[in-house]
Amino acid sequence: MISNRKTLTDYLGYEDSDLRFYEILSDKDNYTIDAGVEIVYQHYRKHGFPYYQIREDEKHKHLRKLQKFNVNTIFKDNQITQTMHALRLCWSYFPHAWSVKCGGAKYTPMDIYISDEKFKSAIRKCWKLFDGISDNTIRKILKIYTNSQAVSNFRPSAAKLIYENFGGDTIWDMSCGWGGRLIGFLASSRPKYIGTEPSSRTFEGLERIKKDFNYLTKTVELHKLGSEVFEPEKDSLDLCFTSPPYFDTEKYSDEETQSFKKYPTEDKWVNGFLYKTIENCYNGLKGNKYMLINIANTPKYKFIEEETVRISKELGFKQEKTIELTLSSVMGTGYKYEPIFVFKK
């Protein structure tokens, strides 16, 4: 328990409710679950959603750590294992990600937070599941709460690995998303990144990443439009690499530029968005260069992988192999893999 409570409240301006919350952070066993849940609930109602926070000086430390990391250590037996390098850095630029509808989930993590009843229930589950209460465990429980799902980010370390092993001077990331591949590029030895992203709020986050790391001797060229619209110069690219939208699985925004809005049926999405994106890659790539696409079937849409391979071969790509990308383990359920299809022009 906090022993100098009067000093902290009278002279340093701490409120008693904050001190009780900090006591729970230190040792929640000093409180009953009912009392603790109410204290934690009131804390987050007062201070807001536990977004990822990172200080300015920390940003550069996170990137330097990824720069120094030997990414070849995470590639074995044709599998890429995940690490957390610079992931918090990525998420700090995209607070709106917590409000994005994902898969067939009924709620977003933000929906759970906004609902008094559901948020208290989530805190209670957090209290029982985890050893301690913190911003991190609250974020975790909001992600896995019943009928809730959060969007995922491509691991920057996995992106760096791909750039170092398949890239050249100029890389096109067709669907930038949450910045994992951009941060991975900034930590790599490659000199030029071209990114396309139609979502306005997500694009703003990407622009902030570019600005924060503009001291690096690299070129970052961002375009606020979809990959099916962007036409790179012929034979100008050394690598095309992305993880595109899985049709309407993640609804990043309600803007009409989103692929699931422009192409609202499976057939239109495959032949309008996916086909045109892969065609733009083929036209932009130099000979003997690679296109890597991380995309997977979903329970609702089982055509995605097959159509990606079909279109790529139809346009002239040769499929060399398929890499397995390790995804997060959810509450002890074991690891899951997604394919990264490797095509060569």
Task: Locate each region found by the language model.
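Short alpha-helix immediately C-terminal to the canonical SAM-binding loop
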Residues: 201-206
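Class I S-adenosyl-L-methionine
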Residues: 299-345
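S-adenosyl-L-methionine
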Residues: 207-234
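Mobile active-site "lid"/loop adjacent to the S-adenosyl-L-methionine
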Residues: 237-277, 299
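Conserved proline-anchored active-site loop of SAM-dependent methyltransferases
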Residues: 159-165, 170-186, 195-197, 227, ...
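Helix-to-beta-strand junctions that scaffold the AdoMet/dcAdoMet cofactor pocket
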Residues: 284-287
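N-terminal accessory regions of S-adenosyl-L-methionine
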Residues: 1-152, 296, 302-303, 314
